[in-house]
Amino acid sequence: MKKIYSRISLYFTLATFLIGACSEDFLNRTPPSVFTEINYFKNVDELETGLVACFAMLRSGFVFDHWMTDDLNSDDADCGSSPGDQPLLYDISYSRMKPSSDYMWYFWSDYYSVIARCNEVIDRSAGTKGDPVEIEKIVDQAKYLRALSYYHLVSTYGDVPLVNRFLNPEELKLRRAPVEEIWTQIESDLKDATILPTVSNWNESGRVTSGAVYSLLGKVYLTRKKYQLTNAAFQKVVSSGEYQLVPDYGFIFRHEGENCAESVFEIQHKTNIPDGNLGTYSETFRMPRDYAAGGWGFDTPTKDLLNEFEPGDPRIIYTFIFPGDVFPAQKEGTTFTVECFESPTGYNARKVWIPWSERAGLNMLEYDYNCRYMRYAEVLLLYAESLNELNKQDSARMLVNMVRARARNTPITDPQRVSCAYDLSYTGELLPDVTAS
């Protein structure tokens, strides 16, 4: 992703210009240094910079981290914090959203901002000079990001405007397209993008790979109950040999677990780079609301979610922070005890915890922790769901048991905690394989 980070500041120069020597008729001339959609995108580097602008929108904490749109809408999480803090998030958590809600506008606006940027890259590529293979890779990544945005839009809102080309201002009054048209566009974009390179053939983390494309395409097919097509898409991911379940579930959510063998698509964050911070505040939003913990306490996991785990499941301690858990404190050599202060559920989220030793020199609104958008475990479980729908239960159980085996072999001691208040001890058979009986 080095190239993407180094170019991101160039995107912001597209709205600026320099005026050279003055003359009487300079106002009637187009300044040669002005970048517009007409004179930009002339070569592969400029088209790549346009793609960077598309990726830049993924950093929005309101959309692609999807805890606001997905977690809070489920029984797995409560808004958290206190009722007077971010009341609009409480409306989401309790299904009281209104069209006038700021957050509804944020989601809608950010998704369509991605789509607009992708449309421009795709449309302007026709006039780009350079290696056609490189141009196609840029275009196909933009198509994936456009499909990803429409996937969230149609899943959240149903009928939405379908915009698949760059629009002029006078064209911006649009009707809502039927859901079927949106799904058709998503499928079309993803099928075009399946020719993208695999993980092994990209030399930059964060790129869209064929595995990421097939994973989202399989999820789309599953949503639409196209089970044969679902199986074909997920089989492409599994048979590629590019992904595997890492032995330690907790490792995935630590800094060293970023872009690991289980990561299918991951949104990259980076801080302290020459062009500025490209970090995230999602972790600050969700870490415990406590001075010693340094978070704001939103997105608290619920008792309902805890009850979904089987006794002794090691994943519990990598999902929940419990009252009484002890962590290393900000001052080296000291500790503090989490109280889950103002958590309406009595718990906090563990996956977003950042050790104090990794926060040194970082702005609390700009942490360099990636968003694990799609993991191989999710692919396997979605694949199993599709196989089950086609009465291929033996194959489905095999995939489910792969995930269960990894879970039961995960260490029961969290290396980033001093101690955990939750008792994981269990004398029965831990997470046994699912069988036909």
Positions of PLM-derived features:
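Bacterial N-terminal signal peptides that target proteins for export
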Residues: 2-12
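Short coil/linker segments at helix-helix boundaries
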Residues: 159-179
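Surface-exposed, extracytoplasmic segments of Gram-negative outer-membrane nutrient-acquisition systems
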Residues: 326-365, 399
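C-terminal motif of bacterial Sec signal peptides marking the signal peptidase cleavage site
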Residues: 19-21
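Surface-exposed intrinsically disordered loops and tails
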Residues: 182, 412-437
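Short linear capping/connector segments at secondary-structure termini
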Residues: 32-36, 96, 164-171, 418-422
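Conserved, well-structured interaction surfaces
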Residues: 48-52, 56-61, 84-157, 180-181, ...
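An aromatic- and glycine-enriched ligand-binding surface/loop that stacks and positions planar moieties
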Residues: 23-86, 183, 191-192, 197, ...
